[in-house]
């Protein structure tokens, strides 16, 4: 039986971080965490592209373009959707996640979903360097592991 598992070894692949400007106080921390995680694992700044889009709704279309270019080993999607008084939250959060999944399945490029969908600002802060860690860092580590795994798989 063959066992495949990625690891955090540095790779020659490029990484794209696509982040929304909406809720920048949160997303800027997520981006910094992702960049720090990649750098801490041997990925140079010249191998990281940061792409900013207006909001979470626009992340999947940018991810699709980046994935289709074939220039990146993985895409790290970062955003923050906070529940409000309308159903808009559900539309944005759910369809963003669905769009990101579609991109990775259609292109074969791993897309890590670090788009926070939270009830309150405090929940987002807890996941952007607070008591629940930094989801940008976690997505970057998962991206690195998946790039390595994709290189191993037949």
UniProtKB/Swiss-Prot annotation:
<protein>
    <recommendedName>
        <fullName>6,7-dimethyl-8-ribityllumazine synthase</fullName>
        <ecNumber>2.5.1.78</ecNumber>
    </recommendedName>
</protein>
<keyword id="KW-0808">Transferase</keyword>
<feature type="binding site">
    <location>
        <position position="127"/>
    </location>
    <ligand>
        <name>(2S)-2-hydroxy-3-oxobutyl phosphate</name>
    </ligand>
</feature>
<comment type="function">
    <text>Catalyzes the formation of 6,7-dimethyl-8-ribityllumazine by condensation of 5-amino-6-(D-ribitylamino)uracil with 3,4-dihydroxy-2-butanone 4-phosphate. This is the penultimate step in the biosynthesis of riboflavin.</text>
</comment>
<dbReference type="InterPro" id="IPR036467">
    <property type="entry name" value="LS/RS_sf"/>
</dbReference>
<dbReference type="GO" id="GO:0009349">
    <property type="term" value="C:riboflavin synthase complex"/>
</dbReference>
<feature type="binding site">
    <location>
        <begin position="56"/>
        <end position="58"/>
    </location>
    <ligand>
        <name>5-amino-6-(D-ribitylamino)uracil</name>
    </ligand>
</feature>
<dbReference type="GO" id="GO:0005829">
    <property type="term" value="C:cytosol"/>
</dbReference>
<dbReference type="InterPro" id="IPR002180">
    <property type="entry name" value="LS/RS"/>
</dbReference>
<dbReference type="InterPro" id="IPR034964">
    <property type="entry name" value="LS"/>
</dbReference>
<dbReference type="GO" id="GO:0009231">
    <property type="term" value="P:riboflavin biosynthetic process"/>
</dbReference>
<feature type="active site" description="Proton donor">
    <location>
        <position position="88"/>
    </location>
</feature>
<dbReference type="GO" id="GO:0000906">
    <property type="term" value="F:6,7-dimethyl-8-ribityllumazine synthase activity"/>
</dbReference>
<feature type="binding site">
    <location>
        <begin position="80"/>
        <end position="82"/>
    </location>
    <ligand>
        <name>5-amino-6-(D-ribitylamino)uracil</name>
    </ligand>
</feature>
<comment type="pathway">
    <text>Cofactor biosynthesis; riboflavin biosynthesis; riboflavin from 2-hydroxy-3-oxobutyl phosphate and 5-amino-6-(D-ribitylamino)uracil: step 1/2.</text>
</comment>
<feature type="binding site">
    <location>
        <position position="113"/>
    </location>
    <ligand>
        <name>5-amino-6-(D-ribitylamino)uracil</name>
    </ligand>
</feature>
<feature type="binding site">
    <location>
        <position position="22"/>
    </location>
    <ligand>
        <name>5-amino-6-(D-ribitylamino)uracil</name>
    </ligand>
</feature>
<keyword id="KW-0686">Riboflavin biosynthesis</keyword>
<comment type="subunit">
    <text>Forms an icosahedral capsid composed of 60 subunits, arranged as a dodecamer of pentamers.</text>
</comment>
<feature type="binding site">
    <location>
        <begin position="85"/>
        <end position="86"/>
    </location>
    <ligand>
        <name>(2S)-2-hydroxy-3-oxobutyl phosphate</name>
    </ligand>
</feature>
<dbReference type="Pfam" id="PF00885">
    <property type="entry name" value="DMRL_synthase"/>
</dbReference>
<comment type="similarity">
    <text>Belongs to the DMRL synthase family.</text>
</comment>
């Amino acid at each position: 039986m063959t066992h495949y598992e990625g690891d955090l070894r540095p790779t020659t692949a490029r990484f794209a971080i696509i982040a929304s400007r909406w809720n920048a106080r949160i997303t800027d921390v997520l981006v910094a965490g992702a960049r720090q995680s990649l750098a801490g694992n041997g990925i140079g700044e010249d191998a990281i592209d940061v792409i900013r889009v207006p909001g979470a709704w626009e992340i999947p279309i940018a991810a699709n373009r980046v994935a289709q270019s074939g220039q990146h080993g993985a895409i790290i999607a970062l955003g923050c959707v906070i529940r409000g008084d309308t159903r808009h939250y559900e539309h944005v959060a759910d369809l963003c996640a669905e769009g990101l999944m579609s991109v990775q399945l259609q292109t074969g490029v791993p897309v890590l979903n670090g788009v926070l969908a939270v009830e309150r600002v405090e929940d987002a802060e807890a996941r952007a360097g607070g008591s629940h860690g930094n989801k940008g860092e976690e997505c970057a580590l998962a991206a690195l592991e998946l790039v390595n795994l994709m290189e191993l798989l037949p």
